[in-house]
Amino acid sequence: MESISLTSLASEKLAEAGRSHSGRAAHTIHGGHTHELRQTVLALLAGHDLSEHDSPGEASLQVLQGHVRLTTGDDTWEGKAGDYVVIPAERHALHAIEDSVIMLTVLKSLPANH
């Protein structure tokens, strides 16, 4: 059984985001392209965004640190450390109100020939 410290990883990714022109950094902690389940820790500096994009499939967002705003066409949700939301299956965007770290969990269907 393998485990990691989300607290340590969050600090590491925030530091990396601070050195990045995009103001963000990410690390997949489970899964990837050959798995149906993927969990990614994403750090986003205050004022930076993940611009509007299509939903990748069934997904949830857990705020590990900071304060973020998730927007869809008709709705807005704000979350702080410890908050959790199921991401609607529609176009959405994420904005960091404060330096923030989230864990994004996505369930994707694999191609039938995989």
Language model features with spans:
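A short, N-terminal "cap"/entry segment at the start of jelly-roll beta-barrel domains
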Residues: 1-36, 71
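Conserved short histidine dyad/triad with adjacent acidic residue
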Residues: 23-26, 38-55
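Short beta-strand segments in beta-sandwich/barrel cores
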Residues: 48-50, 66-71, 92
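Glycine- and acidic-residue-biased ligand/ion/polar-headgroup-sensing regions
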Residues: 57-73
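A cytosolic small-molecule/anion-sensing beta-strand core signal
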Residues: 64-65, 80-81, 98
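Short acidic-glycine-tyrosine-enriched beta hairpin
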Residues: 73-89
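Ligand-binding loop in jelly-roll beta-barrel domains
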Residues: 89-112
